[in-house]
Curated annotation (Swiss-Prot):
Region of interest: Framework-2: 54-70
Cross-referenced InterPro entries: Ig-like_dom (IPR007110), Ig-like_dom_sf (IPR036179), Ig-like_fold (IPR013783), Ig_V-set (IPR013106), IgV_Light_Chain (IPR050150)
The Ig-like domain, residue ranges: 20-105
Location of region: Framework-3: 78-105
Physiological role: Probable non-functional open reading frame (ORF) of V region of the variable domain of immunoglobulin light chains. Non-functional ORF generally cannot participate in the synthesis of a productive immunoglobulin chain due to altered V-(D)-J or switch recombination and/or splicing site (at mRNA level) and/or conserved amino acid change (protein level). Immunoglobulins, also known as antibodies, are membrane-bound or secreted glycoproteins produced by B lymphocytes.
Highest taxon in the source lineage: Eukaryota
Subcellular localization: Secreted; Cell membrane
Protein name: Probable non-functional immunoglobulin lambda variable 5-48
Length: 105
């Protein structure tokens, strides 16, 4: 079954120059059924991913965005209502990126 959502990352509490954050995401990602996927969204230099809560949304064609989860740290995260636990968030300080893991595709 083809599952091709558009996943968006938003930063919370963006003020001043931070509202001009530049985010880079791969244009596409392919994975086999049953496999896992790792989607990244990298922040521009000068903005530390460690300082922000990362929000992930799923948007399918013709539908509004659906909130999946937000992630600040392992002890401070929130899963959206009805969103399966196979969706999880993380951060990678070494690449300055927010990460969305999806298992069991």
């Amino acid at each position: 079954m083809a599952w091709t959502p558009l996943l968006l990352l938003f930063l919370s509490h963006c003020t001043g120059s931070l509202s001009q954050a530049v985010l880079t995401q791969p244009t596409s990602l392919s994975a086999s059924p049953g496999a896992s996927a790792r989607l990244t969204c990298t922040l521009r230099s000068g903005i530390s991913v460690g300082s922000y809560r990362i929000y992930w949304y799923q948007q399918k064609p013709g539908s509004p965005p659906r909130y999946l989860l937000n992630y600040y740290s392992d002890s401070d995260k929130h899963q959206g209502s009805g969103v399966p636990s196979r969706f999880s968030g993380s951060k990678d300080a070494s690449t300055n990126a927010g990460i969305l893991f999806i298992s069991g595709l």
